[in-house]
């Protein structure tokens, strides 16, 4: 009877094994296995199923209870990164990746190193695969919980902008332009270069104290070909990107030559960086302008801008807007003067003579000189010589390829001499291999070193534009001071003349009141040599009356009293303008000096550090590969 029970029990266990996929435990042991009942959340309550083994004689059939978790954990998936151990039911419910896992490609653990497959230090899957909870950039203002509200740093990691393709679009009448297909989250939109220009122009007017990232300069293919070294050269596009831009993901749907391709990829890189940097700016993302730019419903960006009352009401010049809120520009701001080049030179001379705002001006003068020198070192130093080095390596690659072909032909001619032909073949293969390695190196230097350096130069230019904006506001303030001092001097002079005229009129009125006849004889001059004759004063009065009649015939001249009133109004307006510009200048100076420029410096340090790391890695890998190639040649020569 016991054997029959064992058979039935084994059959039951086999049936459970087929249903659950668990192996049958060996005889002679007893244990409890907790089977996970997967619920909607991926975690179920354990269901105990006793499994009894065959117990030997003399045993008391005591059951040893042992709870074994069989739920599929994150560590059991070979495509998931290793998670924490020691899970409990409550801990499993708190794992962020348990609800919806995003498979991770194991190939992404390694970069294209051509030889060694060096592992990358990538971020955790939970961080890199986090998706945005809303399609709107300013969704942070919505009613979302604190745990679900994505921060700017999280959006930077999870929501990246990519330009998927660049294609030629015809406008008709033989005209065409390059359109860029932008992907953000789950939507795509098509924009042209002039749309990016318009967006940046609006951002500069909306955020005059913020460093707006640069976009590539507008130039024709011909001009761009002249501005780059080796414009006719073709460079191999690297399989790995640099920074946040991977050019291998962008496709050019057009028949273009080498110069066109480099210009388009240059624009793709800088425009992608431009949009991604805007996404990380907390001040800009509080508005909806980036959302509007990436909205597929806004097919024509220029029509959208023209139809917006906010954009159309912005002042044309950032020098005539309220820097704290350009959409709320006051009447005083709109009437502020705009300094020109001549006034700048004049005011610089006067300011240096009078030593006005010496400390503040000196501080920003030093900052401007430092940033100008920084930009010059990047543009005419590192960037310039790296372009030259890239061209040299490109020419060397061509020479290696040609000399490899020559050695191959020579080996074919010396086929009857087996040993010599073999040595020539090894040399041919070595030069060909070095040429291939150089081609990869040149492509990486051009796209992943020179292009980021060029972007750094443009960023330095944008920083200097911000410093220049502060300088123009300073000159504007000096212009108002100069104009105010001039108006005050005019008012004092006019009041002095009015007082003199009043004295003359008073003397004439006094003489007329004494007698109806006017004594034209010279009165006794007892007032000293500086006194004026009575006749002279009288004739001055007649001349004044005659000039008034004459002027009334030709044109109506403003009388001194009215001119004095107008001057007082102008002085009042200039005083208000001076107060506004001084307050603006103080705010602008603090924001630029204490916020924007330090932030720019930190970002540039990080970017340049990454560029230098890439540079040393590329050169090291090429040197290692080239060394192995020539070591192989030496081994063959030693055994020959």
Swiss-Prot record:
<feature type="binding site">
    <location>
        <position position="194"/>
    </location>
    <ligand>
        <name>a 1,2-diacyl-sn-glycero-3-phospho-(1D-myo-inositol-3-phosphate)</name>
    </ligand>
</feature>
<dbReference type="InterPro" id="IPR001683">
    <property type="entry name" value="PX_dom"/>
</dbReference>
<feature type="region of interest" description="Disordered">
    <location>
        <begin position="1"/>
        <end position="63"/>
    </location>
</feature>
<dbReference type="GO" id="GO:0005829">
    <property type="term" value="C:cytosol"/>
</dbReference>
<protein>
    <recommendedName>
        <fullName>Autophagy-related protein 20</fullName>
    </recommendedName>
</protein>
<feature type="binding site">
    <location>
        <position position="192"/>
    </location>
    <ligand>
        <name>a 1,2-diacyl-sn-glycero-3-phospho-(1D-myo-inositol-3-phosphate)</name>
    </ligand>
</feature>
<keyword id="KW-0007">Acetylation</keyword>
<feature type="binding site">
    <location>
        <position position="267"/>
    </location>
    <ligand>
        <name>a 1,2-diacyl-sn-glycero-3-phospho-(1D-myo-inositol-3-phosphate)</name>
    </ligand>
</feature>
<comment type="subunit">
    <text>Forms a complex with SNX4 and ATG17.</text>
</comment>
<keyword id="KW-0072">Autophagy</keyword>
<keyword id="KW-0597">Phosphoprotein</keyword>
<feature type="modified residue" description="Phosphoserine">
    <location>
        <position position="361"/>
    </location>
</feature>
<dbReference type="GO" id="GO:0032266">
    <property type="term" value="F:phosphatidylinositol-3-phosphate binding"/>
</dbReference>
<dbReference type="GO" id="GO:0015031">
    <property type="term" value="P:protein transport"/>
</dbReference>
<dbReference type="InterPro" id="IPR036871">
    <property type="entry name" value="PX_dom_sf"/>
</dbReference>
<feature type="coiled-coil region">
    <location>
        <begin position="475"/>
        <end position="512"/>
    </location>
</feature>
<comment type="function">
    <text>Required for cytoplasm to vacuole transport (Cvt), pexophagy and mitophagy. Also involved in endoplasmic reticulum-specific autophagic process and is essential for the survival of cells subjected to severe ER stress. Functions in protein retrieval from the endocytic pathway. Required for proper sorting of the v-SNARE protein SNC1.</text>
</comment>
<feature type="modified residue" description="Phosphoserine">
    <location>
        <position position="363"/>
    </location>
</feature>
<dbReference type="InterPro" id="IPR027267">
    <property type="entry name" value="AH/BAR_dom_sf"/>
</dbReference>
<feature type="coiled-coil region">
    <location>
        <begin position="562"/>
        <end position="593"/>
    </location>
</feature>
<dbReference type="GO" id="GO:0042147">
    <property type="term" value="P:retrograde transport, endosome to Golgi"/>
</dbReference>
<feature type="binding site">
    <location>
        <position position="218"/>
    </location>
    <ligand>
        <name>a 1,2-diacyl-sn-glycero-3-phospho-(1D-myo-inositol-3-phosphate)</name>
    </ligand>
</feature>
<keyword id="KW-0446">Lipid-binding</keyword>
<comment type="similarity">
    <text>Belongs to the sorting nexin family.</text>
</comment>
<dbReference type="InterPro" id="IPR051079">
    <property type="entry name" value="Sorting_Nexin_Autophagy"/>
</dbReference>
<dbReference type="Pfam" id="PF00787">
    <property type="entry name" value="PX"/>
</dbReference>
<dbReference type="GO" id="GO:0010008">
    <property type="term" value="C:endosome membrane"/>
</dbReference>
<dbReference type="GO" id="GO:0034045">
    <property type="term" value="C:phagophore assembly site membrane"/>
</dbReference>
<feature type="modified residue" description="N-acetylserine">
    <location>
        <position position="2"/>
    </location>
</feature>
<keyword id="KW-0967">Endosome</keyword>
<dbReference type="InterPro" id="IPR044106">
    <property type="entry name" value="PX_Snx41/Atg20"/>
</dbReference>
<feature type="region of interest" description="Disordered">
    <location>
        <begin position="135"/>
        <end position="155"/>
    </location>
</feature>
<keyword id="KW-0653">Protein transport</keyword>
<feature type="domain" description="PX">
    <location>
        <begin position="140"/>
        <end position="301"/>
    </location>
</feature>
<keyword id="KW-0175">Coiled coil</keyword>
<feature type="compositionally biased region" description="Polar residues">
    <location>
        <begin position="1"/>
        <end position="18"/>
    </location>
</feature>
<keyword id="KW-0813">Transport</keyword>
<feature type="compositionally biased region" description="Polar residues">
    <location>
        <begin position="135"/>
        <end position="153"/>
    </location>
</feature>
<keyword id="KW-0472">Membrane</keyword>
<dbReference type="GO" id="GO:0006914">
    <property type="term" value="P:autophagy"/>
</dbReference>
